[in-house]
């Protein structure tokens, strides 16, 4: 089955890495459905996808919303072949100061939503005996980071989830993998001062930060036929910041 005849769903597709992934998928001839939490975000998705797909509002903190919206997608006869769990948030704080809400929101969006999104598409993938599930992890899920207990826990949790799901559907033509970025160019990194920037850079053997395009390239590969024998894996894209 050729990738260009597929339909992909990308969460958090209105900006940054999600937008880059969605654009690259659409350039491959894939119909892309992108999610955002705002009306303006949906407009952005519709604008850059044009005839190659569309956007819709989805609140990943709300499990009822996920189930309802995904049911709507299925009723419109869209069968998801490729699921990209890209959306994620941070809410940094030391454990002694971290509120329940800061913990719960990060876990809900970064980990729990991946469970619900994957569950919402897995039956149709099994029926077709074809599917690609690719989730954006983080080097922090392996290294940990001071002030990011919630974020680190959410990204670490993805590892066990994907390995287990990969085992469950390995004989069904479905692959389940993670792309784990290191330090990449985002709107957040633009606000770092010189000291902070150099501190991050000192941890990277390649002595440069990565780009959204480099992360997206790994996602596109895992979504393709060329990666049909790869499952339950984490592809690290971090310039040598973390090596397995």
Curated annotation (Swiss-Prot):
Homology family: Belongs to the short-chain dehydrogenases/reductases (SDR) family.
Enzyme class, spelled out: oxidoreductase
Gene of this entry: fabG
Extra information: Calcium ions stabilize the structure, and may inhibit FabG activity by obstructing access to the active site.
Pathway(s) where this gene product acts: Lipid metabolism; fatty acid biosynthesis
A Pfam family of this chain: adh_short_C2
Catalytic-site annotation from UniProt: 151
Residues holding Ca(2+) 2: 145
Reported function: Catalyzes the NADPH-dependent reduction of beta-ketoacyl-ACP substrates to beta-hydroxyacyl-ACP products, the first reductive step in the elongation cycle of fatty acid biosynthesis.
SUPFAM superfamilies named in the record: NAD(P)-binding Rossmann-fold domains
EC number: 1.1.1.100
Residues noted as binding NADP(+) in the record, renumbered to the chain: 12-15, 37, 59-60, 86, 151-155, 184
Gene Ontology molecular function, alphabetical: 3-oxoacyl-[acyl-carrier-protein] reductase (NADPH) activity; metal ion binding; NAD binding
Keyword Isomerase: no
Subunit structure: Homotetramer.
Entry annotated with the keyword Amino-acid biosynthesis: no
Reaction it catalyzes: a (3R)-hydroxyacyl-[ACP] + NADP(+) = a 3-oxoacyl-[ACP] + NADPH + H(+)
Biological process (GO), any one: fatty acid biosynthetic process
Originating organism: Buchnera aphidicola subsp. Schizaphis graminum (strain Sg)
Protein name listed in UniProt: 3-oxoacyl-[acyl-carrier-protein] reductase FabG
Binding residue positions for Ca(2+) 1: 50, 53
InterPro entries: 3oxo_ACP_reduc (IPR011284), NAD(P)-bd_dom_sf (IPR036291), Sc_DH/Rdtase_CS (IPR020904), SDR (IPR050259), SDR_fam (IPR002347)
Coiled coil location: none
